[in-house]
């Protein structure tokens, strides 16, 4: 096993010799993703948590038509249940964009869907031994590398706290290498999101909390002083080719999503801290050293609005920021990255979590679920997908898909696809049957 992982790590490093430079599609895709949508997305895939007593109660991939020219616009056209409830959370495309990987934070299963026919996704492989083979728990972020899938976990099998690591898999679903989160030189060992700037040979990671916390009821957790101490307060700068952590950045308050500027001349990224409601800029200073700088507040931090997902515009002049507990989305002018200005806000509902925007910035989509035990209860448990047009000043609602009414479950992570680029997708992958 060690020889296999070492060989895989060497192959991984060699794979970065050619750096692609094209960005399109969703603005949070890995820069190594090809076959990008350059026009109107046609389908939206929503990785959805099953709910007890609702529909088939299973986690599922829900596909919605988002093409205004379609007679099924705004309608669910496909649901693919995967069986059971394991805390469905995030997804990510392989580099050739044919396969969508989707993870569950509780039972650690990973599902690989073939999207050669995006209106009818097919489940072609389930990885059931992620925790056993890696020692990690909670496969959270799925980030494409050349011929590989980089997975950021949230926890571990021994203590279920936030000590965790990164796992690299082949596109065929075979484990290649493991990379523990740094615990020296100020590292706290926590993980959450991944963001890569290939031009700088930089992998940036953020930090959240472990299984013991994220599977706890939110109301119970916030009243537990010890639990509230178990959140990450760092981000790590890694050498991408060697997969070695080089510097730890102090970013207190659980820095979550990472969004690099997509402009080639830029060398900065944004994140938001969940517990302190702050915006942070990660950049190089005049000496070329990577630093983290607090740049602003989100809402009223004293009320703990709980910032969650963020989305950067393709021109790097705007940033969407969702706050879960007050159900609000905000848009910031970040044309001066060190001086963000809130220029728009809208109350979306009782809760809001994920946000995805088209590359041209004209269409924005929102979903509501965060984590099953953290979502609001009863009548406040909004579960929907909403689609909007954005003109730079106002959000104009186009349609809503009510996941409660349709008995689908909790709407979480979104990914775009289109049948127009199916011919460009990678060839059919051979998936070994050995787990």
UniProtKB/Swiss-Prot annotation:
Q: Which GO terms describe its molecular function?
A: methanethiol oxidase activity; selenium binding
Q: Which cofactor does it need?
A: Cu cation
State a GO cellular component annotated for this protein. Answer: periplasmic space
Its annotated compartments are: Periplasm
User: Which chemical reaction does it catalyze?
Assistant: methanethiol + O2 + H2O = hydrogen sulfide + formaldehyde + H2O2 + H(+)
Note the superkingdom of the native organism. Bacteria
Stated EC number for the protein is 1.8.3.4
* Key words, A-Z: Copper, Oxidoreductase, Periplasm, Signal
Q: What does the entry report regarding how activity is regulated?
A: Inhibited by EDTA but not by EGTA.
Question: Which pathway?
Answer: Organosulfur degradation
Identify the stretch annotated as signal peptide in this record: 1-24
Instruction: Outline what the protein does.
Output: Catalyzes the oxidation of methanethiol. Can also degrade ethanethiol, but not methanol, methylamine or dimethylsulfide.
* UniProt record similarity statement: Belongs to the selenium-binding protein family.
Assembly behavior: Homotetramer.
Q: What name does this protein carry? A: Methanethiol oxidase
Q: Which organism is it from?
A: Hyphomicrobium sp
């Amino acid at each position: 096993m060690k020889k296999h992982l070492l060989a895989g790590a060497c192959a991984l490093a060699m794979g970065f010799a050619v750096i692609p430079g094209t960005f399109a599609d969703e603005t949070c895709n890995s820069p190594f993703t090809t076959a990008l949508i350059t026009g109107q997305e046609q389908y939206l895939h929503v990785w959805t948590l099953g709910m007890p007593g609702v529909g088939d109660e299973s986690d599922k991939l829900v596909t919605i038509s988002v093409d205004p020219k379609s007679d099924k616009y705004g309608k669910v056209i496909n649901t693919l249940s995967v069986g059971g409830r394991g805390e469905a959370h995030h997804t990510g495309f392989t580099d050739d964009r044919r396969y969508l990987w989707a993870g569950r934070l509780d039972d650690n299963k990973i599902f690989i869907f073939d999207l050669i026919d995006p209106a009818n996704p097919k489940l072609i492989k389930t990885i059931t031994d992620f925790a056993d083979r890696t020692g990690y728990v909670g496969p959270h972020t799925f980030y494409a590398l050349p011929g590989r899938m980089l997975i950021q976990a949230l926890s571990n099998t021994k203590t279920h706290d936030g000590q965790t690591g990164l796992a690299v898999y082949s596109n065929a679903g075979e484990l290649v290498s493991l990379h523990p989160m740094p615990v020296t030189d100020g590292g706290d060992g926590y993980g959450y999101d991944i963001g890569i700037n290939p031009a700088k040979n930089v992998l940036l990671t953020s930090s959240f909390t472990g299984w013991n916390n994220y599977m706890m009821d939110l109301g119970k957790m916030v009243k537990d002083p010890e639990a509230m101490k178990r959140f990450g307060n760092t981000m790590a700068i890694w050498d991408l080719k060697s997969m070695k952590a080089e510097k730890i950045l102090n970013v207190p308050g659980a820095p979550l999503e990472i969004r690099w500027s997509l402009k080639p001349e830029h060398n900065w990224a944004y994140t938001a801290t969940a517990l302190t409601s702050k915006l942070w800029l990660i950049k190089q200073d005049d000496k070329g050293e990577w630093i983290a700088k607090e740049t602003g507040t989100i809402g009223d931090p004293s009320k703990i609005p709980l910032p969650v997902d963020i989305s950067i515009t393709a021109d790097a002049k705007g940033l969407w920021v969702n706050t879960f507990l007050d159900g609000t989305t905000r848009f910031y002018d970040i044309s001066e990255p060190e001086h963000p200005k809130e220029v728009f806000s809208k109350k979306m509902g009782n809760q809001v979590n994920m946000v995805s925007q088209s590359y041209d910035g004209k269409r924005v989509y929102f979903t509501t679920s965060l984590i099953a035990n953290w979502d609001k209860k009863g009548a406040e448990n909004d579960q929907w997908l909403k689609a909007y047009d954005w003109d730079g000043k106002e959000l104009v609602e186009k349609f809503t898909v009510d996941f409660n009414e349709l008995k689908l479950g909790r709407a979480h992570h979104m990914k775009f696809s289109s049948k127009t680029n199916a011919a460009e997708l990678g060839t059919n992958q051979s998936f070994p049957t050995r787990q």
